[in-house]
A protein has these predicted regions:
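A structural signal for multi-pass alpha-helical bundles of membrane permease subunits
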Residues: 8, 12-312
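Short, intrinsically disordered terminal tails adjacent to the first/last structured region
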Residues: 1-5
Length: 312
């Protein structure tokens, strides 16, 4: 008679728990170091006030706790300061403009480069140029052409001229066009690398089934690189309110037209222009932006998971 020894109760569960813990150690350590560690002092500043000589206190002059007063000030400013409403509007507008224009073109250009199409070489040179050269060099060239060269051409051809960066009505679209051009490099690099990892056997099988050039992109390439696409989209959502969209590079701290500022630029501007006594309120702004961004990122992740071609 053969007897089978029973495993000790809970052994498998313990092994599973240890395995899960090992998987979570690195991301949790990264979160603790690069978020909690880096922002620990900023979080503490929310509950303090400036007392002079770069010193802060948790107590008011009357001896009571500062508490949530900085958060209250931050919330009041968010709903009663025009710069905040303009910043939110522009940040969201730039994000959605990039989503409906830049994202599809990123994918298509990456696909042309991946398939080694004739136009792919030209696109690679033109769109990689801003990533290869210094950002300040490309900005100076772009600004000189748009603000100095283009008005001369328009005056010669149509008898009219304008300064794209000084005119508030055209500055926004001019900044967007620069971001549109300069933003291809990193995304194309990620997409082409992901496409290059697709197995040749999968591509050959699709060709044997008679798939067309663009049919291969829709039915094979895009579903296979969807994890990369999802990662880029979630990263973009997280950075909506932190991105200053090169406004500082074009205008510095004070010269940007009020109608084109973004949340990221306004926060950067206030951090550099306001005194140390304003740091607690700025820290409160940062916490609020985090509280807003995290649910947006989770919603984006959930929505992208639902439309994942590999899951359906």
């Amino acid at each position: 008679m053969v007897t089978v020894k029973k495993a000790k109760w809970g052994t498998e569960k313990v092994k599973q728990a240890i395995f899960c813990a090992c998987l979570l150690v690195l991301p949790l350590l990264q979160f603790c170091i690069f978020y909690i560690g880096v922002n620990f002092n900023s979080i503490l500043l929310i509950f303090q006030r400036f007392v002079g000589n770069n010193k802060f206190s948790f107590l008011t002059e009357s001896g009571t706790a500062v508490g949530l007063s900085n958060l209250k000030t931050a919330f009041y400013d968010l709903f009663h300061t025009r710069n905040w409403s303009v910043g939110f509007k522009n940040s969201l507008l730039l994000f959605f403009l990039g989503l409906v224009t830049h994202t599809p073109l990123n994918l298509i250009v990456s696909y042309f480069i991946y398939k080694k199409a004739r136009i792919g070489g030209v696109l690679k040179v033109v769109l990689y140029a801003p990533s290869i050269m210094s950002a300040m060099v490309t900005i100076v060239i772009y600004k000189f052409f748009v603000d100095e060269g283009l008005p001369v051409l328009l005056n010669k051809w149509f008898g009219t001229s304008y300064g794209a960066f000084t005119d508030g009505s055209t500055a926004f679209i001019t900044i967007f066009l620069y971001g549109f051009w300069s933003g291809f490099g990193s995304s194309i690099l990620l997409y082409t690398n992901a496409m290059g990892a697709i197995s040749d056997s999968i591509v050959e099988a699709a060709k044997l089934d008679g798939v067309s050039f663009f049919g291969e992109f829709i039915h094979v390439t895009f579903p296979m690189i969807f994890p990369t696409f999802k990662m880029i989209m979630i990263t973009n959502v997280v950075g909506i309110f932190g991105n200053q969209f090169t406004l500082f590079e074009f205008y510095g701290l004070t010269a940007a037209p009020p109608d084109i500022i973004t949340v990221g630029y306004y926060l950067f501007q206030q951090t550099n222009l306001m005194g140390s006594d304003y740091y607690p309120v700025l820290s409160a702004y940062g916490l609020i932006m985090t509280i807003v961004s995290v649910p947006l990122a989770l919603l984006a992740r959930r929505g992208l998971n639902k439309i994942d071609p590999m899951e359906s």
